[in-house]
């Protein structure tokens, strides 16, 4: 299979790329910086500003994609009144509307997609005072992906809501619980274990203390 991982140049996205490459997939990753990894093909892509034209151009240049993994995220904490227009747009573009444009372009080009894997967060279902825009974006892509499972052109959808992981995502963010966060390689393994099966839609939560996987919905 050919797997495209958006936000795959670091963190969980790169850990997933390693898992899929080891399983024999041809893996293409997007990101802002090229990863030090010889098992992927890298496509530079910055989703933070006006992503639609860049996504259309990229998809047109790619081979047919069997599996889309959307693992892109951008985080800024603060009350809604604390955040600038630019910060709000960046979070929504990267963590939200980028997925919409990728799905539109892939389905327009290919007519179908075998698998969609969407990485959200516990912020998909847990409201947090200092994460209103992040809550909005993660809940939005979770429900959008659920709707994609109702589109007959998409064969299988897996939505994954993990707790925080020890990645560069938290660089520059003051946290006192980094030592309690999940290991990204372990999370990637759980995603691959949850992928097989006869379903159209599955939603799993990957939680910590203790580290575990909960199946929240399946049909």
Q: Residues of each region from the PLM?
A:
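Conserved glycine-rich Rossmann-like NAD(P)H-binding loop of the short-chain dehydrogenase/reductase
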Residues: 23-38
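Catalytic loop of short-chain dehydrogenase/reductase
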Residues: 115-153, 164
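N-terminal Rossmann NAD(P)H-binding glycine-rich loop of SDR-like oxidoreductase domains
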Residues: 9-18
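Rossmann-fold cofactor-recognition segment
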Residues: 38-52
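C-terminal helical subdomain
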Residues: 155, 159-160, 175-219
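Hydrophobic positions on the long internal alpha-helix
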Residues: 69, 98-106, 110, 144-145
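Catalytic Tyr-X3-Lys loop
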Residues: 74, 81-101, 141
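Rossmann-fold scaffold of SDR-type NAD(P)-dependent oxidoreductases
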Residues: 6, 65-73, 95, 118, ...
């Amino acid at each position: 299979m050919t797997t495209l991982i958006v936000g795959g140049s670091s963190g969980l996205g790169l850990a997933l790329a390693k898992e899929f490459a080891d399983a024999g997939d041809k893996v293409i990753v997007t990101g802002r910086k090229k990863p030090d990894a010889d098992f992927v093909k890298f496509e530079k892509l910055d989703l933070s500003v006006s992503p639609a034209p860049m996504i259309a151009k990229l998809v047109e240049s790619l081979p047919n994609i069997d599996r889309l993994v959307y693992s892109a995220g951008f985080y800024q904490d603060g009350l809604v009144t604390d955040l600038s227009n630019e910060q709000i747009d960046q979070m929504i573009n990267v963590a939200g509307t980028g997925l919409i444009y990728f799905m539109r372009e892939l389905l327009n080009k290919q007519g179908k997609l075998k698998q969609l894997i969407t990485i959200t967060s516990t912020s998909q279902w847990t409201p947090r005072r200092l994460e209103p825009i992040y809550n909005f974006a993660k809940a939005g892509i979770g429900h959008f992906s659920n709707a994609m499972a109702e589109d007959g052109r998409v064969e299988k959808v897996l939505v994954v809501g993990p707790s925080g992981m020890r990645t560069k995502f938290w660089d520059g963010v003051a946290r006192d619980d980094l030592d309690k966060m999940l290991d990204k390689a372990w999370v990637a393994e759980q995603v691959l274990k949850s992928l097989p099966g006869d379903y159209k839609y599955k939603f799993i939560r990957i939680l910590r203390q203790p580290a575990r996987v909960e199946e929240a919905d399946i049909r």
